[in-house]
Swiss-Prot record:
Name recorded for this polypeptide: Global nitrogen regulator NrpRI
Species the sequence originates in: Methanosarcina mazei (strain ATCC BAA-159 / DSM 3647 / Goe1 / Go1 / JCM 11833 / OCM 88) (Methanosarcina frisia)
Subunit structure comment from the entry: Forms a complex with NrpRII and the general archaeal transcription factors TBP and TFB. Interacts directly with NrpRII.
Disruption phenotype: Disruption results in significantly increased transcript levels of genes involved in nitrogen fixation or nitrogen assimilation though growing under nitrogen sufficiency. It also leads to a significant reduction of the lag-phase after a shift from nitrogen sufficiency to nitrogen limitation.
Cross-referenced InterPro entries: NRD, NrpR, NrpR_dom_sf, RNase_R_HTH_12, WH_DNA-bd_sf
Region (NRD): 86-323
Regulation: Under nitrogen limitation, binding of 2-oxoglutarate to the NrpRI/NrpRII complex decreases the binding affinity of NrpRI to DNA as well as the binding affinity of NrpRII to TBP and TFB, which leads to removal of the complex from the operator, RNA polymerase recruitment and initiation of transcription.
Biological role: Plays a major role in nitrogen regulation. Under nitrogen sufficiency, binds to the nifH and the glnk1 promoters, leading to repression of the transcription of the genes.
One annotated GO molecular function: DNA binding
């Protein structure tokens, strides 16, 4: 039986390959693993890749790098399921740490979601995402478009990619100010009279191996279009917990973010009190943050087919344009 530590590294390498939009090489894999706290060099990665090749889990594409086979995808999904319960939170913490955006200079990297859709739907996609963002139900009205021939992203034929700002950017802004943020829940938030009323459903980040927001997306229970048209309905939102000592500082940072249009609809609760029906631990307060993909949910409600990868990657905010 192979050393559990080697098996652990094999799974992490497979995750990196899985999350890449195109074939990825050993050097890039090593760099990404180092970002995630794994001290492993390019040579060691090549050794592990040979094992994955022999098992039929990876496919080599010349000098471009490797992708996962169907067998590899299944193995990654099945392996070490117990360990993956903390993976979503670790992913959020990692991306928050990599956030470098500064509202005062309007420069730096933000966390983004990547979605793919048919070229023919381009005008509708832009119009509805813009409408949703400017109404305050997304994190930012800035997006970045990736054409089919983009060198930065591998897209299926006939598809266009769009990057939208992820709510984890909020975690990053606070972390850079020395304020740790705890991902508590993802959920469905009821909107009444254009204001947050209560959470209708919640999934704890600590109790799932899948991003709760993605779970709710797949259930398609939102009514973002009704929120936009009537001011009432259901949207996606996250709930964060923050230590009570950071209450005033959190408010100040949010105001700075709002001035540059990077906040969306964020509701801060009171210390030691439930927020919109969601429980809060003693000595902390809650922050309800709108999901960065509510515009995508609105598009799905119209019948447009669109595939989304939440918490996908980092982008320079200045390369994103307001729509």
């Amino acid at each position: 039986m192979m050393d559990p530590q080697i098996e652990r590294k094999l799974i992490e390498i497979m995750r990196v390959i899985h999350e890449s939009d195109k074939p990825i090489g050993a050097r890039a894999i090593a760099d990404e693993l180092n970002n995630r706290g794994y001290d492993i060099g390019e040579r060691a990665v090549r050794y592990h890749l040979r094992i994955l090749d022999e098992r039929g889990f990876t496919r080599k594409h010349g000098y471009a790098g490797r992708t996962l086979t169907d067998l590899g995808e299944n193995e990654m999904n099945d392996a070490l399921i117990g360990d993956r319960f903390g993976f979503v939170i670790s992913r959020i913490e990692e991306m928050a740490f990599r956030t470098t955006y500064n509202p005062e200079t309007d420069k730096g990297d933000v966390v983004v979601n990547i979605s793919y859709f048919d070229k023919d739907d381009f005008e509708t996609v832009i119009e509805l995402i813009s409408y949703t963002a400017h109404a305050g139900y997304m994190i930012s009205p800035r997006v970045r478009i990736f054409e089919e021939d983009s060198l930065e992203m591998s897209l299926p034929p006939g598809k266009i990619g769009i990057a939208t700002v992820c709510s984890v950017t909020f975690d990053g802004l606070l972390l850079k100010a020395g304020i740790p943020v705890e991902p508590a829940y993802g959920g469905i938030l009821q909107i009444e009279n254009k204001k947050p009323a209560r959470f209708l459903d919640l999934i704890s980040y600590s109790g799932t191996s899948i991003d709760p927001i993605k779970i709710f997306m797949n259930r398609t229970p939102t009514s973002v279009l009704e929120v936009l048209e009537k001011g009432e309905g259901k949207i996606l939102a996250n709930m964060r917990q923050i230590n009570s000592s950071a209450y005033e500082m959190t408010g100040k940072i949010l105001k700075k973010a709002e001035k540059v249009g990077l906040a969306g609809c964020i509701t801060l609760g009171e210390i030691d009190e439930y927020l919109l029906g969601a429980p809060v631990e003693t000595g902390k307060f809650g922050a309800a943050v709108v999901g960065g993909i509510n515009g995508i949910c609105a598009l799905e409600e119209t019948g447009i087919e669109i595939e989304t990868n939440p918490i996908s990657t980092m982008l320079d905010y200045q390369t994103m344009k307001e729509i």
